[in-house]
């Protein structure tokens, strides 16, 4: 299990609604295990805004929770769970959604937890 800062695996970590479009620009994520690249955009993060439902089995969720406790990191308000399509590594992207008044909102990618034991 690894906790990785988002800026080391994503090409873009900040999205703002009044500047970025829903599907462009994209942020490219590179899996640290197999180097597979996936693209994410603001719409992906809006879809999972304030998400607290995991698609991982309970055991996987518990391991991630323990990793956060061990790292002493505060849990951001949103996450996306998925399995790398190439190497099948369990991956959770943690991000913070924010509102900036009446006209804008956005997302800041914080860190990624991968289970390289799967």
PLM regions: where:
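Short, flexible, mixed-charge glycine/proline-rich loop motifs
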Residues: 16-28, 72-78
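Short cysteine-rich clusters marking metal-coordination/redox-active sites
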Residues: 29-34, 84-87
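Short cysteine/histidine-rich zinc-coordinating motifs and their immediately flanking basic loops
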Residues: 42-50, 95-102
């Amino acid at each position: 299990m690894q906790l990785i800062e988002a800026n080391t695996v994503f090409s873009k970590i900040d999205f703002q609604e009044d500047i970025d479009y829903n599907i462009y620009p994209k942020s490219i994520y590179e899996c640290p295990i197999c180097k597979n690249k996936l693209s994410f955009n603001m719409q992906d993060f809006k879809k999972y805004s304030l998400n607290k439902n995991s698609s991982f089995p309970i055991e996987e969720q518990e391991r991630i929770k323990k990793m956060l406790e061990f790292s002493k990191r505060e849990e951001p308000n949103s996450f996306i769970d998925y399995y790398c399509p190439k190497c099948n590594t369990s991956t959770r992207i943690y991000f913070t959604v924010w509102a900036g008044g009446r006209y804008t909102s956005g997302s800041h990618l914080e860190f990624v937890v991968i289970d390289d034991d799967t």
